[in-house]
Amino acid sequence: MDFHIRNSNLQEIEVRRKPHSRSPKIQQTEAEATAMNFRIPATASSIPTKYQTVFIPTSEKNGFNSRSLRFSYSLTQNENPGPGAYNVARTSADINSVSLSKKGTGGFPSKAPRTLQCKIARTPAPNAYNVYEEFFSKKDFSKGNSSMFQQPIAMEVEDTNHLTPAPNQYSASLTYCHPNNNVSAHAAFVSKTKRELLKPNPVKGPSPCHYKINDSLVKESTKVPVSCFKSKTSRNSLNVISDNPGPASYDPYKSSESEKKIIFLRKHYLCFSAPAMPIPKAPPVPGPGHYDIVDYEGLPKQYMSGAAFVSNTSRWAGDVSGKSLPGPGAYHPEIPGRYSFLYNSNRKWVPA
C-alpha cells in the first residue's frame, strides 16, 4: 500500500507500509531498504499494527558529492489561492451596507437600494476545475542533468536540398501507352475510325533546330518612359540574315565561262561499259549588270461595274493617251469608184 505525505520541509515523501513480521523475507527487505537509504523508525509503534512504515525520500542523487538543491522552491506548492480563499456565499448587500444605521431606520425610510445589485454569475467554483499537470510552466531544474550529460538542444539538420529522386525512382504510367478501347462488343458494321487518344505513329514534325524563335515576346521591355507615337522600325540590324551574295561575290570584268561540251569517246559510246558522264555544273548566277530594270507599274485598271444587271458595253476606251494610234500621215485616202456586177448562171454576182 503506497501513498504520499508532506513533511515540515515541504518535501514530498513516499510512504510504503509493509506487513510487520520478522520472517527471513522481511529481514531481507529491511536490509535492502537500508542499502537504498530508506528511513526506518528505530522504535516500534505503541499501537499494534500489521504494517511497518518506511520513508522513501525523493531527493536527488549525489552528483559530484553535492546534495544541495539548486532551487529552493518545491513543485508541490501552488502560488494560486486555494478553493477556501474565495467568498462565494450569496449574502445580501443591504445587511453589510455602510449607509444603513445600526439603530434602525426612521418612520419613512427610503426603499431604494443604496448599492447596485450585482448579479452573481453562475460560474463554476475554483475547485471545480481539473487542471492537468502538463499545463504548468514550472519545471524542477534541480533534478535535471547537467549539459555535459545530455545532447545539445540545437541539432544539426540534414540538408535535403540535394536529395532528389533518381531517374529510376519514378513510376511511369502505362495507361496512355496502349489503346483505351475496352469495348468487348462487336457490331456487324464496324466503324474503322480509331478511338485511341494518342496516335500510334510519331508526328513527323520539324526538329527543334528548324525553328526560328521570335525573341520580341520573351525579352523584357525597358522601364523608361516611352512616347505614345513609338516608331516600329527595328533598330537591331545585326539579326537580319540575308541569303543574297555579298558585295565581293561579283566580278563585273570577268568573262562569262562557256559551257564545256561533253566529248563522248568513240570507243565506249555504244557499250554498256561506258564511263559515267559527268553532271554539268549549274550556270553562274547573273550579276548586277545583267539586269535591265524597267519601271513596271502593271496593267492599267479596268473599271468594271459590280451591279446586278451588268451592261455588256465596254467602258474601257483602251489607250487614252493615243500613243499607239496611227498619226495623220499614216492614211492614204482614196475615192471609191463605180463597180458593175453581172449575175451569172451560178447565181453569183461577178464584177464586170
Swiss-Prot record:
Family: Belongs to the STPG1 family.
GO MF assignments: chromatin binding; histone binding
Family matches, as PANTHER family: PROTEIN STPG4
Keywords: Apoptosis, Cytoplasm, Nucleus, Repeat
GO biological process: apoptotic process; epigenetic programing of male pronucleus
Annotated organism of origin: Xenopus laevis
Compartments reported by the entry: Cytoplasm; Nucleus
STPGR repeat positions: 80-90, 124-139, 165-171, 205-235, 244-263, 286-295, 325-335
Protein name: O(6)-methylguanine-induced apoptosis 2
InterPro entries reported for this sequence: SHIPPO-rpt
A GO cellular component annotation in the UniProt record: male pronucleus
Pfam annotation, one family: SHIPPO-rpt
